[in-house]
Amino acid sequence: MYKKKIKKNTITHFGFQNVPTFIKSYLVSNVFHKVATKYDLMNDLMSFGIHRIWKQFLIQQSEVHNGYKVLDLAGGTGDLSIKFSKLVGKKGIVILLDNNDTMLRLGQKKLRNLGILNNVHYIQANAEFLPFSENTFNCVAISFGLRNFTYKQKSLYEIYRVLRPGGKLLILDFSIPTSKLLTILYDLYSFHIIPKIGKIIAQDSKSYQYLVESIRMHPDQETLKNMILSIGFNDVQYFNMTGGIAALHCAYKY
């Protein structure tokens, strides 16, 4: 099981930039403060709405039932929490956790406007230091969040700690396309079109430039699978979606 200590005074990546690890969380949070109000709209525009299909597939693979306790980690504006709240019912609970208070407030407002009031709770916290006891959750899900974490392995260890035996982890994020042609087209779209959309819609091209770069710095499908295995998870598998542009990793804690 992973027990590596976090080293201080090290360098990590923020997109394609090298930055001291201690400021990455601040830089990432600043990005999401800037894009928060246009986040849902930009997701629909950038992915042509396909992100909703990817998230629905995550829900279908989650095996969440009535009465379950679910952690929507880095849950942002709450797309997964909306769906999980229906699955867990009145006897269950969903924790929508995000490190960014602006995103969290928008998520809370969105869910309340939908009438989701009782079985979703909201917590601002860092994924590397989850404020929960061991063996708390039946399911932990992360949707397009892991690539923004400073210490991915530490976060995965924390997830392992708070999952109950038999609990399931699901990680949905952008990944590596499976064909060279798709990679070329995807790169052209990502680097030349997405920042322009961000400038027009959100008046912020730099934040979307970072988001594009962060995708390229994220571990590929096999690397992430091995990272998850190294923590102690079992039955790790992944599903490529839209030619590998996104991938869903699933694993269990036994």
Curated annotation (Swiss-Prot):
Pathway: Quinol/quinone metabolism; menaquinone biosynthesis; menaquinol from 1,4-dihydroxy-2-naphthoate: step 2/2; Cofactor biosynthesis; ubiquinone biosynthesis. S-adenosyl-L-methionine binds at residues 77, 98, 126-127, 143. GO terms for biological process: aerobic respiration; menaquinone biosynthetic process; methylation. One of its GO terms (molecular function) is 2-methoxy-6-polyprenyl-1,4-benzoquinol methyltransferase activity. It is an enzyme of class 2 (transferase). It catalyses: a 2-demethylmenaquinol + S-adenosyl-L-methionine = a menaquinol + S-adenosyl-L-homocysteine + H(+); a 2-methoxy-6-(all-trans-polyprenyl)benzene-1,4-diol + S-adenosyl-L-methionine = a 5-methoxy-2-methyl-3-(all-trans-polyprenyl)benzene-1,4-diol + S-adenosyl-L-homocysteine + H(+). Keywords: Menaquinone biosynthesis, Methyltransferase, S-adenosyl-L-methionine, Transferase, Ubiquinone biosynthesis. It holds the Pfam family Ubie_methyltran. Its EC number is 2.1.1.163, 2.1.1.201. The keyword Isomerase does not apply. Methyltransferase required for the conversion of demethylmenaquinol (DMKH2) to menaquinol (MKH2) and the conversion of 2-polyprenyl-6-methoxy-1,4-benzoquinol (DDMQH2) to 2-polyprenyl-3-methyl-6-methoxy-1,4-benzoquinol (DMQH2). Belongs to the class I-like SAM-binding methyltransferase superfamily. MenG/UbiE family. This is Ubiquinone/menaquinone biosynthesis C-methyltransferase UbiE. It comes from Blochmanniella floridana. The lineage of its organism: Bacteria, Pseudomonadati, Pseudomonadota, Gammaproteobacteria, Enterobacterales. The gene is ubiE.
